[in-house]
Amino acid sequence: MPSDGRCWETLRALRNSSKGRLRYDREWLLRYEDVLEECMSLPKLSSYSGWVVDHILPNTSHHTQENAPSSDNSPSSGSASGLYQSTLKSPVRSSPQSPSPSTPSGTQSAHESPFTEPIALQSSRAIKVEGCIRMYELAHRMRGTEGLRQWQEEQERKVQALSEMASEQLKRFDELKELKLHKEFRDLQEVMEKSTREALGHQEKLKAEHRHRAKILNLKLREAEQQRVKQAEQEQLRKEEGQIRLRSLYTLQEEVLQLNQQLDASSQHKDLLNVDLAAFQTRGNQLCGLISGIIRTTLESGYPTAENQAEAERVLQEMRDLLSNLEQEITRASEMKKKDEEEARVKLQESQVQQGPGAPTKTSAPSPSLVGTQSEDLQVKVQDSTMQWYQQLQDASAKCVLAFEDLTSSKDSQIKKIKMDLQKAATIPVSQISTIAGSKLKEVFDKIHSLLSGKPVQSGGRSVCVTLNPQGLDFVQYKLAEKFVKQGEEEVASHHEAAFPIAVVASGIWMLHPKVGDLILAHLHKKCPYSVPFYPAFKEGMPLEDYQRMLGYQVTDSKVEQQDNFLKRMSGMIRLYAAIIQLQWPYGSRQEAHPHGLNHGWRWLAQILNMEPLSDVTATLLFDFLEVCGNALMKQYQVQFWKMILLIKEDYFPRIEAITSSGQMGSFIRLKQFLEKCLQRREIPVPKGFLTPSFWRS
């Protein structure tokens, strides 16, 4: 190309120029950097350089090519000479009115009249150099543009190829992914089908097992139902048999009691025949107690068994044998008496014959009958004096009830209200007795004493007085005594320590109001006949329920309370009685004797030891009485008391043990261990809950 030749010519010219032959210091840049910075500003071309490149340089280049020598050895010289010879006017000298060649309008006017005015140009060489530079830049720019265009095309082709390749790879990837998904789906479908088949097989197996188990279960249910029906039939049969046995036991008990009455009736021959029948009566009472214990045990456990019935029949047979032996003994005694009388009559006749008919006759007394050996058996009945005292107390209680009958049977609402107020005023303070403090106990005592003394007291926010009704005092005394005994039956039975605060208040009230004390004893003897001590006897024609009530049992709807509950109530009342006889109200006169003191406790202990023991009852009551009152009796009677304890251990324990069954040995063992421990220590311990002097200061 022509421009390439011009560039080389220019370079040669520059190399051969004076400046081109200059030597440059390479370190100068570091030393004179500041000078260079002043020259580093970008060179600026004339505003008409573009116009020169577009209009003048092409003509000059064309003219130079035409006049250029054909020889290749002098291109640079020709170029240089041309540059130096050319003299043009610079465009700077042009008129200011000439349009700028850079604008389109200026360019158009330049084409119309490019030489309207003479233009002062630089030298042709400078213009040529500048034009060569411009042409070189233009060619370089064009080459760069062409290279860039080719590079862009190449990159576009590569991008397109890469895009096509990526598209193909994406298609292959999608195909592989779809294939993989299809394979996974097929595998999953196969697994699901396999699982379904296995589940169906397992389900069929479970159904078969279920049918098999259902069949077995139905068989078991039928067997269980048959067993249940069989058991129900057996239970019904057992129940019927038990009821039959129970009725039979009642029949046997009734027959035993009747035979025992015959034994008692036979006692009339005791004085006539001079024979001791106490052994027969004692054994008869023991047999009655034994059959009663059998019935009581069977009622607690359900229905009587064949063994119970057999045992009751043995008791009946023994009672019959006992009665037969008694009759034989009476017959034998009667025959012996007749024989003795006959012998005495024969001897009398013989003596009369020997004396002769003239001899005076002597009236000889009949020969004494054979005196049997003193029986060592204990008595069953209580002493006559004790029974008279017991009956007097019951009569006084019944008379007191009759005294306030009008108050209790009245239909008048006002009288009913008075009765309720009096009953609350009498019973609520007793319920408030506790071991909290001595001062609280004194408040309760003062309130009860004030009520009995006719003073008004506050009860339920109202003022109450016994003078509100003429029969009020008798009613209050009766209800108060009843409440004291009821507290022993319930509160003391559950909490043994409660016996002492209740007893000390009752003792203080008894000392100031003796009638209340007699009513307390009457209620106590009625609910607990063993506090007399008294063992009620069965009378002919008496209903069995009435007899059980006389013994102290609670009978509700023909059902007798359980033995444990019965013993618990009896224990509570005996503990209250044992606490009353040893305690005195501390704020009363010390010189006054206790209205029912320890001498009555000694009497009770002596009398109960003179009576035949009852199974489970005697051992329980002895333990409760001695645990509460033993310490006071020991201090009062000392040696005599210990003799009594030794008597219990040596003589009375074997009697209790002989009549106690294996299931009722708990109370006997408890009493035995208690007395053995006391004998070992030579002391009866102070009962738990005993009121000490410090209590009354609280």
Curated annotation (Swiss-Prot):
Biological process (GO), any one: poly(A)+ mRNA export from nucleus
Basic and acidic residues: bias regions: 333-348
Molecular function terms from GO: identical protein binding; inositol hexakisphosphate binding; phospholipid binding; translation initiation factor binding
Chief location bin: nucleus
Residues the record lists as Phosphoserine modifications: S41, S90, S100, S351
Entries under InterPro entries matching the protein: GLE1, GLE1-like_sf
Record flagged with keyword Coiled coil: yes
Chain intervals for the UniProt region annotation (Disordered): 62-119, 333-374
Signal peptide range in chain numbering: none
A cellular component term, taken from the record's GO annotations: nuclear envelope
Coiled-coil stretches: 152-274, 305-355
Biased composition (Low complexity): 67-82
Spans annotated as Mediates the shuttling between the nucleus and the cytoplasm: 444-483
Subcellular location: Nucleus; Cytoplasm; Nucleus, Nuclear pore complex
Family annotation (Pfam families): GLE1
Subunit note: Associated with the NPC, however it may not be a stable component of the NPC complex since it shuttles between the nucleus and the cytoplasm. Interacts with nuclear pore complex proteins NUP155 and NUPL2.
Record function comment: Required for the export of mRNAs containing poly(A) tails from the nucleus into the cytoplasm. May be involved in the terminal step of the mRNA transport through the nuclear pore complex (NPC).
Family: Belongs to the GLE1 family.
Protein name listed in UniProt: mRNA export factor GLE1
Organism: Rattus norvegicus (Rat)
Gene: Gle1
